[in-house]
Amino acid sequence: MKEELTILRKFEHIEHCLKRNVEAHVSNGFEDVYFVHKSLPEIDKDEIDLTVEFLGRKFDYPIMITGMTGGTRREEIAGKINRTLAMAAEELNIPFGVGSQRAMIEKPETWESYYVRDVAPDIFLIGNLGAPQFGKNAKKRYSVKEVLYAIEKIEADAIAIHMNPLQESVQPEGDTTYAGVLEALAEIKSSINYPVIAKETGAGVSKEVAIELESVGIDAIDISGLGGTSWSAVEYYRAKDSEKRKIALKFWDWGIKTAISLAEVRWATNLPIIASGGMRDGVMMAKALAMGASLVGIALPVLRPAARGDVEGVVRIIRGYAEEIKNVMFLVGARNIRELRRVPLVITGFVREWLLQRIDLNSYLRSRFKH
C-alpha cells in the first residue's frame, strides 16, 4: 500500500506541475543583479565558447536538466518525460537528472521509467534519492546498498541526494526524519566511487549547510533556490482538507532566493554549484554563471514539451537560452564562462541587503571565479 501511494504521489506531482500555477509568488532575486554594459567588447561574437567542465566531463552548454519525475511504467507519462528529456540532453551534450527513485526502490518494476541509456547512451546521467530516507529514524532507512542500486540499475554517472524538508513538512504523508542525514551522506561519500550531489528542491541552500556538505566530501551542490517551482504549492493542490491547505499556502514562498543562495554558497565553499530555481531566461542564467555557478539547472520550462514527447521542442528551448547567454557574454566582452565570472557585477536592493548581513560581499565579488 505504501509503495502504491508513493507512485500515486509522483503522478500527482507531475499532474499539478503541468496543469497548475505552482511557481513561487516572489522572484529568485536576479533582478537585483546587473551587468555593466561594455560598448567596446573587443571580441567577435562568433568566437564565444559556451563549453564548461563539471565533475570531470565537458559539456557543450552550461545548462543541465534537473530531476523531475519517474516511478510509473516506461510507456506512461513519467517514463515518456524522462526519455524525451534524455534524448534532448544527448543531442545537446548536457547533463540530465532523473526524479526521485524512491518509487523504484519500493516497487522495482517501475525501474524502466528511469532507464534512458537505450536512447541516450552518452549523456551524463544523475540518479536521485531523498535525504529523509537516510535519517536515523526513517521507517525503512536507506543505506549505501540502495544508493548503489539506484545508480547501477539505470547506469547513472552520479547520484543526487535531494533535501526537501519544506515539502515533507507540509505533505500529508511527509517524511520528516532528517536527524542523522549528514552522517549518512559522509558514509555514502566514503563508500562509493561515484560523485554525490546534494540537491535542494526550491528553498535554497545557506552558507552554513553548504559548509557542512563540503566537510563530508560532497562533490557539488544544486542550490535550487526560492523563486521557481514551489513544492509547498504542489502540496497545497494535493491537500484534501482545509487545514493542510492552509499550512501549505503559508509556506508557499518559504526559502532563500536563488541569487542569494548562490552568493552564499560560492563565498563559503569551493564546491561546484548548479544554480536552479526559477531560471527562466538566458540573461538570468548568464547572471548566475557570472556569480559563480558551474551550471544552470532547469526543470519546469521543459516539462510540458517533454510530456508531449517533443524532443525538438525541448532542444529549441535550451538552444534559445544558450543564444541569450551568448549575447550577454558578447555585450560584456566575455569569450568564455571563465571570463564571464570576472566581469563587473552590481548587486542592489534586497539581495544586497541580505548579503551584507550574511557574507563579506566585496570578498565574494572578487572570488566568483573559483570554478
Swiss-Prot record:
Catalytic activity, as annotated: isopentenyl diphosphate = dimethylallyl diphosphate
Organism whose genome encodes this protein: Pyrococcus horikoshii (strain ATCC 700860 / DSM 12428 / JCM 9974 / NBRC 100139 / OT-3)
EC number: 5.3.3.2
Keywords associated with the record: Cytoplasm, Flavoprotein, FMN, Isomerase, Isoprene biosynthesis, Magnesium, Metal-binding, NADP
HAMAP family: Idi_2
Top-level lineage group: Archaea
Cell location: Cytoplasm
Lineage, uppermost ranks: Archaea, Methanobacteriati, Methanobacteriota, Thermococci, Thermococcales
UniProt-recorded Gene Ontology molecular function terms: FMN binding; isopentenyl-diphosphate delta-isomerase activity; magnesium ion binding; NADPH binding; oxidoreductase activity
Residues given in the record as FMN binding sites: 66-69, 100, 128, 199, 224, 229, 278-280, 299-300
One GO-annotated biological process of the protein: isoprenoid biosynthetic process
Protein name as annotated: Isopentenyl-diphosphate delta-isomerase
